[in-house]
Amino acid sequence: MGFSEHNLVWLDLEMTGLDPDTDRIIEIATLVTDSQLNILAEGPVLAVRQSEQALAAMDEWNTRTHGESGLIERVRASHLDEAAAEAETLAFLRRWVPERASPMCGNSICQDRRFLYRYMPRLEAWFHYRNLDVSTLKLLANRWHPEVLQGFSKKATHQALEDIRESVAELRHYRAHFLRLPAAGAEGGGAAD
């Protein structure tokens, strides 16, 4: 399967912190699935060059996590600024999904969207205005059926591509164990807007 308006674009960012007014994007990764969550393609995994000042401003958790993963050194070695990483990501996505067709998919994706709006506005605007946020299902499962959470664990490497793969796997888990969808073609199984 190739280019389709039904494909879903999954995205994850690693940042120097959580505040888009003071923190910066240091890694971006994307992948594309079909509507049934089969991975069709993995996009470029890009370390985004940032100043030493931005890296030095990271808190202890970010410094440790991104240092241990090797991301800080990849950021220092990167030749890509935010505009170049945005352009390369858009070039990949345009081969798979028409503009404004896919919701932005991922975990706590609103946070990523805030950073895209600030630092990669063309990429943020390329997505549909809706979000497919796996963390919503996690929160609901925790409140309504906590046993569902026991069947899935994440490595939480805080490496963008691995985090996206885990988000897709997590949504597959919730589809199988929490959403309990009727069989394909069953009454009431149509798509709603």
Curated annotation (Swiss-Prot):
Q: What InterPro entries would the database entry show?
A: Exonuclease_RNaseT/DNA_pol3, Oligoribonuclease, RNaseH-like_sf, RNaseH_sf
Has the keyword Nuclease been applied to this entry?
Answer: yes
Q: Name one GO biological process term.
A: DNA metabolic process
Cite a single GO MF annotation.
3'-5'-RNA exonuclease activity
Q: Which residues form the active site?
A: Y129
Q: Which Pfam families match?
A: RNase_T (PF00929)
The record's section on Gene3D superfamilies has: Ribonuclease H-like superfamily/Ribonuclease H
Superkingdom classification of source: Bacteria
Record-linked SMART domains: EXOIII
Q: Does the keyword Nuclease apply?
A: yes
Every copy of the Exonuclease domain together lies at: 8-171
CDD domains hit by this protein: Orn
- Kindly state which keywords UniProt assigns to this record, in alphabetical order: Cytoplasm, Exonuclease, Hydrolase, Nuclease
- Say where the protein is mainly found: cytoplasm
- The record's EC number reads 3.1.15.-
Its subcellular locations are: Cytoplasm
Q: Where is it found, in Gene Ontology cellular component terms? A: cytoplasm
**Biological function:** 3'-to-5' exoribonuclease specific for small oligoribonucleotides.
- Belongs to which family? Belongs to the oligoribonuclease family.
The molecule here is called Oligoribonuclease
The species this protein belongs to is: Alkalilimnicola ehrlichii (strain ATCC BAA-1101 / DSM 17681 / MLHE-1)
